[in-house]
Amino acid sequence: MTGSQAQVIATFSRRMRLRLANGDEVDARVKGKRMRAVCGDRVVAEPIANETDWLITSIEDRDNALTRPNLRGDIEVLAANVDQLVAVAAPSPDPDWFVVDRYVAAAEQMRVGAAILFNKTDLGSGENEALADYDRIGYPVLECSARDRTGLDELR
């Protein structure tokens, strides 16, 4: 049987959620122990007979990957085929702007767009100097609050 093209949209250890080419979403698992798919991977999968799950049989080449070293010093892939990276911060607890900087730097290294999303503005963010700095150097800065529904249209 030939497989179907799909994209990994969520991972839960060795279980995944795939979006098939026709838009349907299915649960899947990976064939073998060495294959490691991550969110964003384009894969080939096929339905498993007498089950609702699908089986990922291969992972296509990645355009890029967001990586980090793991505790053993090996490179761990966090996401693949990234076309935009959005760093999310909130006013409380105080944002760790160094982490935001690291994500912006990763986006630059991968040559993909970067943006900063400041969430929970209903907590009273006020004027934020760091956000102004990102905006001043050309990164899109979006502010929103899911609680009071502000800024959500711009986010879409």
Map each language-model feature to its residues.
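N-terminal accessory targeting/assembly segments
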Residues: 1-97
